Amino acid sequence: MSTAALLIPAMILDAAFGEPKWLWSRLPHPAVLMGKLVQALDDRLNEGDGRQVKGVIAVAVLVFVGLLLGWILSWFGSLVSVLIAAILIAQRSLIDHVRAVATGLQNDLDAGRSAVAMIVSRDTATMTGPQIARSAIESGAENFSDGVIAPAFWFLVAGLPGLLIYKLINTADSMIGYRTEAYEDFGWAAARLDDVLNILPARLSALLIALVTGRAGDWGEISADARKHRSPNAGWPEAAMARALGVALAGPRSYDGEMRPFAWVNASGSKSASAHSITRCCEVLWKSWGLALVLVVALGLLF
């Protein structure tokens, strides 16, 4: 079977069941195992001199593990491939986490802050309602690219090996891809490879969002806003979502008690995002997922 034919049931299974707690409370989630592998490489290699070279070695190990494991698992048949893809694509989980912020924010600020703290790394203790909403929307848009479209894309392109390599590198980037004293050198290779692997998926995610919301005509503005972002990729789905909802995203935010300047995305949009804005974001993400599924079905029929 083609990878497109396998991806169709995988996307549907993920959307229907997400990450059932009864299962993953008893078994280690593959993402957790990936994190343990990255942590082991960090503990073993991130010390002494030549840390950038050691970081390249760590990334090479991750690529090799993904390639080998994906090749081995592919021999177990289509059902295994579908199940693994369903587990590693995270649309339902993404929506659940983002929607939880809207629910919390509708109750009170503290509940909203607690919910958004689950999905962002910035300081949340003193966030206002609009800041909570913007953070949730930004996270939803970015993770639609990282957690849904990118894994689906690499599964389409290279099957299980492609999917596993992507998830391993993306996990490494989330753990060691920081410009801090500890990871500036060691995490360089993981961060750069993650950037490369997300170039096409990020722009595809933005296009899907723009198409389902009738904002394709704003592509020039979306592109300009995307380039303001510090990440070469995260700005694309965020800029598209900002236009889709008519809100301004990004802007100054606090990390580790320090307020840092970030350019506004869709600066002319409303800066009063709310729980309702988050709910609309979730609706856009489902519509974008639906269009992605239609495209995968079309590929399955063609190939």
From Swiss-Prot:
Primary localisation category? membrane
Q: Which residues cross the membrane?
A: 56-76, 78-98, 149-169, 283-303
User: How is this protein positioned relative to the membrane?
Assistant: Multi-pass membrane protein
Tell me which GO cellular component terms the UniProt record holds.
Answer: plasma membrane
Superkingdom of origin: Bacteria
What UniProt keywords apply to this chain's record, in alphabetical order?
Answer: Cell membrane, Cobalamin biosynthesis, Membrane, Transmembrane, Transmembrane helix
Which molecular-function annotations from GO does this UniProt entry contain? ABC-type vitamin B12 transporter activity; threonine-phosphate decarboxylase activity
Q: Name one Pfam family in it.
A: CobD_Cbib
Give its localization: Cell membrane
**GO BP terms:** cobalamin biosynthetic process
Pathway(s) where this gene product acts = Cofactor biosynthesis; adenosylcobalamin biosynthesis
Query: What family does the database annotate?
Result: Belongs to the CobD/CbiB family.
Which NCBIfam families does this entry report, sorted A to Z? cobal_cbiB (TIGR00380)
Q: What does this protein do?
A: Converts cobyric acid to cobinamide by the addition of aminopropanol on the F carboxylic group.
PANTHER family per the UniProt record, alphabetical: COBALAMIN BIOSYNTHESIS PROTEIN CBIB
Q: Which HAMAP family match?
A: CobD_CbiB (MF_00024)
Specify the protein name.
Cobalamin biosynthesis protein CobD
Native organism is Ruegeria sp. (strain TM1040) (Silicibacter sp.)
Q: Which gene encodes it?
A: cobD
